[in-house]
């Protein structure tokens, strides 16, 4: 039986926390930032948790995370 492969694109985007939740970056903080307020940019800079509806799909893409 061959090994199960990890989706590398997903591995670069998601990190598993110690409590078993997945962290992700927020969208909209790479470019075109000039017109966004400082408050909005600060909030976009932080990490967010993956919604519970999406966790199943993330786990399927990252089979070797526990």
From Swiss-Prot:
Q: Kindly give the PROSITE patterns that the UniProt entry links to this protein.
A: RIBOSOMAL_L35
Top-level division of the source organism's lineage: Bacteria
Gene Ontology, cellular component aspect: cytosolic large ribosomal subunit
* GO-annotated biological processes: translation
- The signal peptide, as residue positions, is none
Q: Which GO terms describe its molecular function?
A: structural constituent of ribosome
Xref: Gene3D superfamilies: 4.10.410.60
**Known Pfam families for this protein?**
Ribosomal_L35p (PF01632)
UniProt keywords, alphabetically: Ribonucleoprotein, Ribosomal protein
Keyword Ribosomal protein belongs to the record: yes
Output the InterPro entries linked to this UniProt entry. Answer: Ribosomal_bL35, Ribosomal_bL35-like, Ribosomal_bL35_CS, Ribosomal_bL35_sf
Recorded family membership: Belongs to the bacterial ribosomal protein bL35 family.
Q: Which NCBIfam families match?
A: rpmI_bact
Q: What is this protein called?
A: Large ribosomal subunit protein bL35
Q: Which organism is it from?
A: Synechococcus sp. (strain JA-2-3B'a(2-13))
């Amino acid at each position: 039986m061959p090994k199960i492969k990890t989706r590398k694109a997903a591995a670069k985007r998601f990190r598993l926390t110690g409590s078993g939740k997945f962290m992700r970056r927020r969208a909209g903080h790479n470019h075109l930032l000039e017109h966004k307020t400082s408050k909005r940019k600060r909030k976009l800079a932080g990490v967010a948790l993956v919604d519970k509806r999406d966790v199943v799909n993330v786990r399927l893409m990252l089979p070797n995370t526990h």
